[in-house]
Regions:
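Positively charged n-region of N-terminal signal peptides that target proteins for export
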Residues: 1-4, 23
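Bacterial N-terminal signal peptides
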Residues: 7-16
Length: 285
């Protein structure tokens, strides 16, 4: 059945050439309301406290400056709680949220050096980079675009716990998958938020890098105020409130046909920088 759905979307895709990286960036630049997330996966090399000290003392002031200027919307730092163990690829995740792709041009080494110099002309950037490299390994970075959610990311503080679901979706079924999430999942999660079952839900699409070697194309983020909220039993009757007489299993079968859950991780919030009511707000180390 999955192949039938994919074939039907292939017919439509034939009339729409694949968007190149340059076209993608150009389109996003024309729509500056798009929320772009630069997600950075990090592996600490030192004690946890030593790594967090580097983030707090060397990098957080820079994030605060960029958020205050409007170049960056927010910065979040999460610690991976599940999976745990020495064999996991990364144990911290930083999320840089931008109002569009234009700000991504400053994510290079030279761009970062220039931003530090702008903040403090006398700063020794090489010493900062050396201390940073000694404290952690940058495993990989990916760029995602916010597709849908119960509350736009730029309008709220991050939750203390987040379950992150990595989804594999064929390119030819991408638009259909997004429509399923918006039509069925979003109304349900909105009711879950009102019922106190969760705090927020978001759907993100990976836009850079692209290619068949990457095992997932989408991420959904389920956010919870605390561990108790994450593990509580769901409030009964929410599906019926959201979708009346629709049979729940029949709808979820539509999801199963076009996407696979590659893996799920649990992240715990460590620190953040956001801008609310024209003020920069921070928490954590």
């Amino acid at each position: 059945m999955k192949h039938v759905l994919i074939f039907s979307f292939l017919l439509a895709i034939l009339w729409n050439p694949v968007t190149s990286h340059a076209q993608l960036i150009s389109q996003t630049q024309r729509n500056q309301t798009t929320q772009v997330l630069d997600i950075v996966y990090l592996k600490s090399k030192t004690l946890r406290s030593e790594y967090l000290k580097v983030e707090s003392e060397l990098w957080k002031p820079l994030h605060e400056s960029r958020v205050a200027s409007g170049e960056m919307t927010a910065w979040f730092l999460f610690e991976v709680t599940y999976p745990y163990g020495s064999n996991r690829d990364y144990d911290f995740v930083a999320i840089n949220i931008f109002p569009g792709t234009e700000s991504l041009k400053n994510q290079s080494l030279e761009g970062t050096r220039a931003m530090f110099k702008k903040l403090n002309p006398n700063v020794d950037t090489e010493a900062i980079f050396e201390k940073t490299d000694a404290s952690r390994e940058l495993v990989k970075g990916e760029v995602f675009t916010f597709i849908a959610g119960t509350t736009p990311l730029k309008l709220r503080e991050p939750s203390d716990f987040m379950q992150v679901n990595f989804m594999r979706v064929p390119d030819v079924a991408a638009k259909y998958y997004e429509s399923l999430e918006k039509q069925y999942a979003l109304p349900l999660h909105s009711l879950r938020v009102k019922a106190g079952d969760m705090q927020n839900w978001s759907l993100l699409k990976r836009t850079l890098p692209l290619g068949v070697d990457y095992p997932y194309q989408y991420i959904t983020m389920d956010e919870y105020a605390n561990w108790e909220m994450l593990t509580k039993e769901p409030t009964p009757g929410l599906w019926e409130q959201a979708h009346d007489n629709l049979v729940e299993q029949e709808i979820w079968n539509k999801f199963i046909e076009v996407r696979d859950l590659v893996r799920q991780e649990t992240w715990r919030l460590v620190s953040y920088v956001i801008k609310q009511d024209a003020m920069v707000r921070t928490r954590g180390r």
